């Protein structure tokens, strides 16, 4: 009996996952995730150099981050660009060096382009959440500016804190020394989860529950790690881009990876936004089913009462007939007595 209950529970759980998957597919088609990802990839490539230039300029403004730029570059290019990271790093560093030599007007233009990317991300995510409200221009600008300026500082501070904690004697001279390499290997995954979680909770205008955002962030981070390994394997084992484009193969490789990355980000957003809708639909289905069952039981009760009253009524009528016959027999008996 217990085994049957466990099997039914597992079956219902798998069916609910399948139903949620179908719900996500309908949302993907309705929101046109592939088109949104292509738009964001295009804007990202246009604003990649400005954002990197702003990041490094913000880090250089704080002396504590003076020796962390190379570590930050290596961390970003090694963990977020699965293939051709060295070539992309060389090109981007050259572009950033050229951009930093520009005039004040050019620097302002770079800032505007970087803000355009953040604005595009904001609009894409809020469209997934079906948000009709809009933020005020001052609020949007302040939020975009905070992300653009404080984001690099927070990333640099986290890397500095991580390197400091790892260098402590507590981790090097105790049994925890074997845990340190495992934690360092898991750092990209942890950073991805934290970044996705912050993105899914802060950017949407609607209120997002923490558990829903955490589920979307975990799925997006796992897909991101799998995507990095799969894309790196494809590029290294099937070098079709290098055979076709030659020295320019880095450009389409970078564009395809940025597109895949944005698809993963939007998939996590769809999961986070679609989960409360699916749970609400399931709740409505249960409530309607319960109401229908209660209505059926109410309609069946009078029918059963009438059925139960049938034999009693027949017995009562039979008794009445007997009583009537007895009453009719009484005058006949009186007449017979008089004749006697």
From Swiss-Prot:
Transmembrane regions: 5-25, 45-65, 102-122, 141-161, 179-199, 213-233, 247-267
Signal peptide start and end residues: none
Main location as per UniProt: membrane
Ranges of biased composition (kind: Basic and acidic residues): 295-308, 323-340
Subcellular location: Cell inner membrane
Presence of keyword Transmembrane helix: yes
Keyword entries, A-Z: Cell inner membrane, Cell membrane, Membrane, Transmembrane, Transmembrane helix
Family matches, as InterPro entries: UPF0761_bac (IPR023679), Virul_fac_BrkB (IPR017039)
Region (Disordered): 292-340
Membrane topology note: Multi-pass membrane protein
Protein family (similarity comment): Belongs to the UPF0761 family.
NCBIfam families per UniProt: PRK01637.1, yihY_not_rbn
Protein name according to UniProt: UPF0761 membrane protein Spea_3909
């Amino acid at each position: 009996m217990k085994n049957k209950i466990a099997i039914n529970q597992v079956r219902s759980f798998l069916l609910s996952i399948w139903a949620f998957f179908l719900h996500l597919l309908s949302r993907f088609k309705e929101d046109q995730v592939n088109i949104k990802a292509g738009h964001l990839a295009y804007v990202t490539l246009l604003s990649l150099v400005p954002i990197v230039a702003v990041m490094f300029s913000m880090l250089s403004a704080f002396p504590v981050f003076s020796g962390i730029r190379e570590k930050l570059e290596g961390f970003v290019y090694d963990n977020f660009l699965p293939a051709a990271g060295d070539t992309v790093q060389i090109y981007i560093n050259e572009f950033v060096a050229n951009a930093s030599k520009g005039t004040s007007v050019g620097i302002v233009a770079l800032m505007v382009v970087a803000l355009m990317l953040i604005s595009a991300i904001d609009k894409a995510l809020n469209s997934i959440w079906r948000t009709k409200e809009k933020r005020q221009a001052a609020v949007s600008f302040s939020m975009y500016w905070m992300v653009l300026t404080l984001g690099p500082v927070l990333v640099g501070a986290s890397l500095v804190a991580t390197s400091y904690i790892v260098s402590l004697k507590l981790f090097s001279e105790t049994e925890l020394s074997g845990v340190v390499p495992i934690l360092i290997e898991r750092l990209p995954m942890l950073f991805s989860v934290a970044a996705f979680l912050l993105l899914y909770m802060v950017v949407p205008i609607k209120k997002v529950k923490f558990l829903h955002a955490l589920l979307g962030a975990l799925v997006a981070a796992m897909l991101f790690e799998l995507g990095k390994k799969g894309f790196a394997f494809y590029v290294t084992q099937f070098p079709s881009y290098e055979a076709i484009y030659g020295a320019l193969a880095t450009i389409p490789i970078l564009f395809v990876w940025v597109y895949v990355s944005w698809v993963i980000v939007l998939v996590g957003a769809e999961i986070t936004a679609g989960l409360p809708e699916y749970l609400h639909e399931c709740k409505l289905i249960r409530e309607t089913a319960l109401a229908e069952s209660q209505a059926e039981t109410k309609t069946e009760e009078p029918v059963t009462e009438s059925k139960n009253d049938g034999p009693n009524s027949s017995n009562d009528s039979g008794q009445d007939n007997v009583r009537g016959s007895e009453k009719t027999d009484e005058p006949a008996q009186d007449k017979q007595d008089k004749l006697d």
